[in-house]
Amino acid sequence: MLDTMRWTGDGLLELLDQTRLPFEKSYIKCTEYTDVAEAIKRLAVRGAPAIGAAAAYGLVLAARKIRANTKKEFLTELEARARELAATRPTAVNLHWALNRMLRKMRLAEPEDAGLLCDLLLEEAQAIFREDITGNRRMARYGLELIPEGARILTHCNAGALATAGYGTALGLVRAAHEAGRRVSVYAGETRPLLQGARLTAWEMLQEGIPVTLITDSMAGYLLAKGKADLVVVGADRIAANGDVANKIGTYSLAVLAREHKIPFYVAAPVSTIDLSLASGEEIPIEERDSSEVTHLAGRPVAPEGVNVWNPAFDVTPARLITAIITDRGIVKPPYDENLRKTVEGLNRNLVIELTAEDGKSNL
């Protein structure tokens, strides 16, 4: 599997350009934090854990260009850059979690020298990257108990190695089951409008030798009606305190279909995706993207010019439709309002700075 991102050691961050997959494998060379911000905005790097790790490295690039006489001045400039990075994607909470973790490291740091502070920032970014991979593998081990022998798994969008620092969340469970010899197979919904399921999930599964069948999003109901899938597993971009889950648009529809056809609907996400500051999914800011993503396909128009378009990137699945949430600290089952809070107890979640979305809603 290709690296989602790699730090070269000489102030260069390389990001796999996922807009070009599966037909071209190329990396974007980022030497400025603005390069990282642009890559996140245009979905060259995507997936909540991946953009969190990328933004952490982006803040390192920003710090290296700051010229300040005091630590206070350094922090002021760094916080401004963090706000810019946070504004790139308002829904995925991992982005804001990672940036606040980086800023907290600076607030608690003893050195006053900018060079030493930059070294500490790099160490923290690398820790975020490493911890995501180990956390994903741990999550997969927990989730294995929910994946039976021969399971036919329906998934949506891409929550694999490409969406993380490595291994994956929802697809990490699939990968672990495959490695355990459970003969699993995958149905990948294409995931309009940007086709992450067709372009990325199908490609990942083929690379791993895991049987995969591609379907259009509108086929999911009939697939379940015909009894061709045993369970649904998806990732998450933000989980509210009551267990409501924001994920790629179309996830809610799958949850409703899974309930109708009485099959389990699982969410796999690290605890950094849980946002206890939001009581329910109604408070989650939902990103809306450009109409051209819907009216054009591969750069060619597929709709009449001038048609009105609504293009939310995410939807919210109510907690009542979710069978269990698989995290890197264990499996969480209802009642979610109690058990999610217990799951994140002991984690340092205190804000250093409030990173606010463009619509004015707090993202943490």
From Swiss-Prot:
Q: What's an example of a GO molecular-function annotation for this chain? A: S-methyl-5-thioribose-1-phosphate isomerase activity
Q: Is-annotated flag, keyword Isomerase?
A: yes
Task: Identify the metabolic or biological route this protein is part of.
Answer: Amino-acid biosynthesis; L-methionine biosynthesis via salvage pathway; L-methionine from S-methyl-5-thio-alpha-D-ribose 1-phosphate: step 1/6
Q: Which branch of life, at top level? A: Bacteria
Q: Where is this site: Transition state stabilizer?
A: 157
Q: Which UniProt keywords apply?
A: Amino-acid biosynthesis, Isomerase, Methionine biosynthesis
Q: What is this protein called?
A: Methylthioribose-1-phosphate isomerase
